[in-house]
Amino acid sequence: MSEPRQILVTSALPYANGSIHLGHMLEYIQTDMWVRFQKLRGNQCVYVCADDAHGSAIMLRAEKEGITPEQLIANVQAEHSSDFADFLVDFDNFHSTHSEENRELSGLIYTRLRDAGHIATRSVTQYFDPEKGMFLADRFIKGTCPKCAAEDQYGDNCEKCGATYAPTELKNPKSAISGATPVLRDSQHFFFKLPDFQAMLQQWTRSGTLQDAVANKLAEWLDSGLQEWDISRDAPYFGFEIPGEPGKYFYVWLDAPIGYMASFKNLCARRPELDFDAFWSEGSKAELYHFIGKDIVNFHALFWPAMLEGSGFRKPTAVNVHGYLTVNGAKMSKSRGTFIKARTYLDHLQPEYLRYYYAAKLGRGVDDLDLNLEDFVQKVNSDLVGKVVNIASRCAGFIHKGNDGVMVAGDAAPDLTEAFLAAAPSIAEAYESRDFGRAMREIMALADRANAWIADKAPWSLAKQEGKQEEVQAICAQGINLFRQLVIFLKPVLPLLAADAEAFLNVAPLTWNDHLSRLENHKLNPFKALMSRIEPAKVEAMIAASKEDLLAAEAKAPAGNGELTKDPLSAEIEFDTFAAVDLRVALIVKAEAVPGADKLLQLTLDIGDERRNVFSGIKSAYPDPSKLEGRLTMMVANLKPRKMRFGVSEGMVMAAGPGGEEIYLLSPDSGAKPGQRIK
């Protein structure tokens, strides 16, 4: 028998600035299923992760909430840990990048790279927010992508085309913090000489470490020539200060992947059988796998292996990349209630429903996965309740009633037993290659055969016939053994169901090799329902709750749209000054263009007991003035009449907006009457 494999597995680090949602959970569930399969096979498989806890976003959010960054990341880590645990994601260690292990390793890798000549320093022209008084990190600049012209993209990479670029390459930049137009200032920065590793990366990315589609995408970047990577940020910044460089900090993407190493090192201190160097030293025989989303491929498949190579550590065995999650065929939407937080899901549905559905749809590629909620309900109910659990519920009662819960010896269906045994290697290969969808299809095909065989034998009918009790017991014992096989095959996906089934079967925790054996002359525990059907009403309630989450978040947070920066609040006034302005509801009786005036409309306003003539510069936003007629608006009624070239204007209507087409005439709520005072 071969020696157990030594395997270290990571998932991408969730950012410590927000809640986990179902899109995130796709990756952690996928990774957890693969890890559980390896452990089920008897391999030494260690699964580590951490919160990504550095960067300007965390610093600014903590400032906004009036707490320290350390308090913020501690709060978020507690929330993340709870969500992962309740989704049955079983990390061996869930750490934080804001740790002493990560500080030490980041400093070590940097100094090794520096001493080997892989770090350059030079002055860069960098964006500075004059309103906030700080240099802007890449994620706090937004503008138009210089590669594909997609708007509203971040300052370091484009979410549409995947390109990376310097913030100064971004077109039409704006500060995402204040809305101000940033100004350019010079600053001394530190660069990782990524081009030093061009040849190594061209070979490594084509060595089977990546899916073909990912390697092909990386080839585009490699063929165009790699650029030096800016790894420093200026104070103020929440992160690790670069050794020997006061006021300069490591860019979050430098120390984030080092967080994998730090989390493992933290675990090694508590698990003496684990040796850090055995997994991370150059020439290590252990296997190292990263599971990530396709949006961060460049960091994990270019920068990260180059950093490891240059600092004397081993490179990953493979980087496994998955696509995004869509819901009902579209991008997750807060307004439609399909942007579903992990906790919102858990408040309404069992975690294993989603674990199974993800498994059933996950392949080896990088295609997006669609969570179709109607199909989700149908598939879980049909496969798990209608097929797998149904076998045990059909057979258990007859064994308890007819033989005091003891399974008889013998094999009532040798051909079926052989088919289940023969399927195991293919199912194992599907798990190993992360082709979870194929594994689920093959498992459910076995469940279909088992159910068809039981239905054909119909023990419920035989139980009513004299002299058929031995046959009933043989059929049901066979059914329970087939159910046990299915539980073993599904255990990486459904650990809770497996644990409940093990309790019913009265057996120790099952391993993969247990599929080679049978239960005979074995006492079962009383059967209890192992899984209930999904009620569509619970899915609808989850969607409604997700919409409520959005409304609650909007109620708590200011718009943050930078309007007050562009047009600051005026100086305070006394109440009497405000009270001197007579605001009234007005009905627009007539609205027409003014001949010879480019911007003006002439409005006839009814304010209850009299009519007013008002000229207003809103023509650019209302090219068809007749559409304003019959509409209520608000006006300043005691403004001194003003003589104009086109006539006398007897007041002013109220509108918002910067001008041009963006002028928005204000209206009172329904029920207001012309002439009523606004107060």
Swiss-Prot record:
GO biological processes: methionyl-tRNA aminoacylation
GO molecular function terms attached to this record: ATP binding; metal ion binding; methionine-tRNA ligase activity; tRNA binding
Keyword tRNA-binding: yes
Keywords: Aminoacyl-tRNA synthetase, ATP-binding, Cytoplasm, Ligase, Metal-binding, Nucleotide-binding, Protein biosynthesis, RNA-binding, tRNA-binding, Zinc
Primary localization: cytoplasm
Domain annotation tRNA-binding: ranges: 577-679
UniProt short sequence motif 'KMSKS' region, positions renumbered to this chain: 331-335
Domain of life: Bacteria
UniProt motif ('HIGH' region) ranges: 14-24
A Pfam entry, by short name: tRNA_bind
GO cellular component entries: cytosol
Binding site for ATP: K334
Cofactor note text: Binds 1 zinc ion per subunit.
Reactions performed catalytically: tRNA(Met) + L-methionine + ATP = L-methionyl-tRNA(Met) + AMP + diphosphate
Residues where Zn(2+) binds: C145, C148, C158, C161
Cofactor(s), by name: Zn(2+)
EC number of this enzyme: 6.1.1.10
Compartments where located: Cytoplasm
Subunit architecture: Homodimer.
Family: Belongs to the class-I aminoacyl-tRNA synthetase family. MetG type 1 subfamily.
Main function: Is required not only for elongation of protein synthesis but also for the initiation of all mRNA translation through initiator tRNA(fMet) aminoacylation.
NCBIfam families registered for this protein in UniProt: metG, metG_C_term, PRK00133.1
Name this polypeptide is given: Methionine--tRNA ligase
Organism for this UniProt entry: Pseudomonas entomophila (strain L48)
